[in-house]
Design a protein with these regions (language model features):
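Loop-rich catalytic cores of soluble enzymes, especially ATP-dependent carboxylate-amine ligases
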Residues: 1-137, 156
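Generic solvent-exposed, charged/amphipathic alpha-helical segments
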Residues: 5, 146, 168-172
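Hydrophobic alpha-helix feature that most strongly marks membrane-spanning transmembrane helices
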Residues: 121, 125, 151, 172-180
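Glycine-rich, often proline-containing surface loops adjacent to acidic residues and nearby aromatics
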Residues: 139-153
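Short secondary-structure subsegments characteristic of cysteine-rich extracellular domains
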Residues: 158-178
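Conserved small/polar residues in nucleotide/adenosyl-binding loops
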Residues: 181-186
Length: 186
């Protein structure tokens, strides 16, 4: 995963297909994007706006000092587990339960592990009924989730064979050990 994270920018650059965004995503904030119509902003020559600041993300992760360590499976799961146990003052103000309803799962920075929004996430065997980090430690990485792939609008399946070949080669290339120092992401 670590080496793939270093190179996954190529996926959005080469295959990005989201140069436009619904105006509601910006919630009235000022933007340098151009107006396409009543409901849409766009950026000329953009590849993937959803992978930038406009896309869905948990801003508390970086602001609260959450750093996920990709240098080993053990460090990855340890840092992810720490993030879901780290309390958030902002979420404490909301509370968990009131008026007979749950407002959120807990008061922590990450409510659940799947709320960590990285472009590359190692995943355990889906048949495991435990938390993802426990599944990873139990059985290792079953597959890697690549969240930077946009649907290809020029094909009925959302991805074509050439894209799949490229991504497969990028993953294989990422398996080659590289002598970089540690990689920890916010």
């Amino acid at each position: 995963s670590r080496n793939l994270l270093r190179n996954d920018w190529m996926i959005a650059y080469l295959f990005g297909c989201s140069p436009a965004v619904c105006k509601s995503y910006l919630s009235g904030k000022k933007t340098q994007l151009e107006s396409f119509d009543q409901h849409t902003y766009y950026e000329k020559n953009a590849t993937s706006l959803r992978m930038g600041d406009i896309g869905y993300q948990n801003n508390l992760e970086e602001n609260m000092g959450v750093h996920i360590d990709y240098n080993s499976l053990e460090k990855y799961t340890e840092s992810l587990t720490k993030a879901i146990k780290e309390p958030s003052d902002e979420y404490k103000k909301i509370g968990v339960f009131s008026d007979g309803y749950y407002k959120q799962i807990n008061e922590n920075i990450l409510q659940i592990e799947n709320e960590y929004y990285s472009t590359v996430r190692p995943k355990p065997d889906p048949s495991y009924t435990c938390r993802p980090s426990k599944g990873l430690l139990k059985g290792g990485v079953n597959y890697i989730e690549l969240r930077s792939i946009d649907n290809n609008i020029y094909t009925n399946t959302g991805i074509d064979l050439e894209q799949m070949y490229f991504i497969e080669l990028l993953i294989i290339y990422s398996l080659i050990p590289v002598s970089y120092t540690h990689l920890t992401l916010p």
